[in-house]
Amino acid sequence: MEEKNQIEETIAALEKKNLSRGHFLKLTAAVGAALAASNIPKIATAMPAKNKTKHRYAMVIDLARCIGCEACTVSCKVEHNVPVASPKELARRIEWTEVYFLKEKGAYPFVNIDIDPRPCMHCEHPPCVDVCPVGATYQDKDRGLVLQRYERCIGCRYCTTACPYGARYFNWSKPYYGGKLREEALNPDPHPQVKKRYKGIVEKCTFCVERLDRLEAKAEKEGRAIRDDELHNICTCVKTCMGRARHFGDLNDLNSTVSKLARSGRAFRLLEELGTEPKVIYLRDWGNKA
């Protein structure tokens, strides 16, 4: 019954967007050519202004403090039951947060490496949301998070193509849950509050929404607001960062750590010219690097 309801919801979403089967197939054929013609900036900048959300959860990453240990990547995989790719599967790997090593300068032992840690940007104006034909990708109206309804995803990968940050990954294989695959999983005891993802759908970073849900429920039960210090370690990548490079909080709270850091002269965002307004903000020492 549940599966039938999910199918009906997906069909309703298609009809709401006036997508017949024929039109949908034509759109599938055209999307690659359209995006190859450099339409991503147009998609991003043409979006209407969104209503302000109650919270604007964001992450600040200090590049000067990131040591490239990738503890963030490993802890994220454990928390969200993301399988580890073998050397043969690297092209089809799934990384909810990835660390890019961009360039290396100098010689050992005086080596300077530019590192770019990159989770989902949870954009204010996410192009992935507008290109999804079935409403599987959506923006949380209260928190501004860009999330995924896995049961609706049809695997068209429009969102993957539209994302200018490469933050979305297609699930090429069955998930590592139970049975014979149990011993192969990085985390043999999967997190019960993290939704399962199935073969043929897209997944990505959620800013650890399952942990945020628990904190919000606790604060509501106690009849109080969420404190900034409680938010800081909500994301598992923040909690396990050895260099203390990551910070998480609410940009709508002007006194929060992330708000103060975002207003500093060291702050910048990736591809700001696209108008996506990402909620991952980077800090760098401009005088030390080209």
Predicted regions: what they are:
Residues 1-19:
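N-terminal secretory signal peptides
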Residues 210-290:
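Long, compositionally biased charged/polar accessory segments in the mid-to-C-terminal portions
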Residues 73-102, 157-163:
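Carboxylate/His-rich catalytic cores and anion/metal-binding grooves
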Residues 12, 48-68, 101-130, 134-161, ...:
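Ferredoxin-like iron-sulfur electron-transfer modules
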Residues 13, 19-40:
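N-terminal export leaders
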